[in-house]
Amino acid sequence: MIYTDPTTGATTSTDAPSTNYLNRLTPNMFLTILAVVVIIALIIIFVQSSSNGNSSGGNVPPNALGGFVNPLNATMRANPFMNTPQRQML
């Protein structure tokens, strides 16, 4: 609590000094810390997504990284109910 002396106008704090950091954490400081954490997380996500997804290394040929593979390809080939003329020509 802040005490103001009525005769001199000087202000003094009557609170005991606190070593707890959470007591000094204002909403402004909290939002600043939160914004910094979000920006760092977005930078990490951006760097990982722009590295072609090959962060594990290994002996993967370079042209296999950029190619598109249809995830439904095996499912569509194994579908017994799909009898199109193009399928019968295979």
UniProtKB/Swiss-Prot annotation:
Subcellular location: Virion membrane
Secretion signal span: none
One Pfam family hit: ODV-E18
Keyword presence, Repressor: no
Spans through the membrane: 27-47
Lineage top rank: taxon: Viruses
GO cellular component, one term: viral envelope
Keyword Transmembrane helix tagged: yes
Major subcellular site: virion
Keywords annotated in UniProt: Membrane, Transmembrane, Transmembrane helix, Viral envelope protein, Virion
More about this protein: Initially termed ODV-18 since it was found only in occluded viruses. New approaches also found the protein in budded virus. It has therefore been renamed to E18.
Function: Component of the polyhedra envelope. Plays an essential role in the budded virus production.
Name listed for the protein in its UniProt record: Protein E18
Organism name: Autographa californica nuclear polyhedrosis virus
Gene: E18
